[in-house]
Amino acid sequence: GMMGLSLILGLMAVMGGSWLTSDEFMGEEMDDDDEVTYGLNALNIVAPDADCDDDTVDAMEEFYDGMEIECDGDTIIATWAMSDQCDFYGDLVETYEDMGMEGDDIKEITDAEDDACAAVTAGTMGTIGMWGGVVLALVATLMMVLPMAGVDAMDAIPEMGQKVISWGAGGLMLLGMVLWYFMLPDGDASMGTGLWIAGAAMSIALGSTLIGQFIPADE
């Protein structure tokens, strides 16, 4: 039913890599054909016509610590965990401070570090909320499906518990999305398909529960 669809969409959203899209990487504008997308915990780059080769991959992976890069012909496909980007800027700040630079001299770098680390926290909150919602959506789906198959494994859950599980599926997804949004650093990125899918999963879960509460199944 609707809760099962919410479960599938929730999984697609939490595991997807395109909650936000941008035309910039680390403050630099990318070429028109390049794609920069942000998931909850990592950013992804697809750069066609980049003359990708082993030397390019080695150089980028050495500079951008933690970044995973592969070539598809001339196309560069890169994934960089938000936590690794946070650490990258932190190491950069330490390097500049060791050189005697501080304050306004490295403000751009420290601001970038703050933003990258804030994105890590936002992604963590979003991930917890979405996964919590997905798990409850799975339980809610089983509560509806198993009795149809003659399995009474869920009968031990009291009615109030069933209501909490049903409302919690969409509620936790909503909470995760709200926390993620308000903890994100300011920027000009646009909504990606993953965010739309997450919104659909949350809306369907809440809608399914709302219908179940006010429209009895035998009517």
Predicted feature residues:
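Individual transmembrane alpha-helices with interfacial aromatic-anchor signatures
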Residues: 188-200
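Signature of small four-pass
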Residues: 1-20, 123-181, 198-216
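Membrane-helix boundary connector in multi-pass membrane proteins
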Residues: 179-190
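Long, glycine/tryptophan/cysteine-rich extracytoplasmic
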Residues: 16-121, 188-189
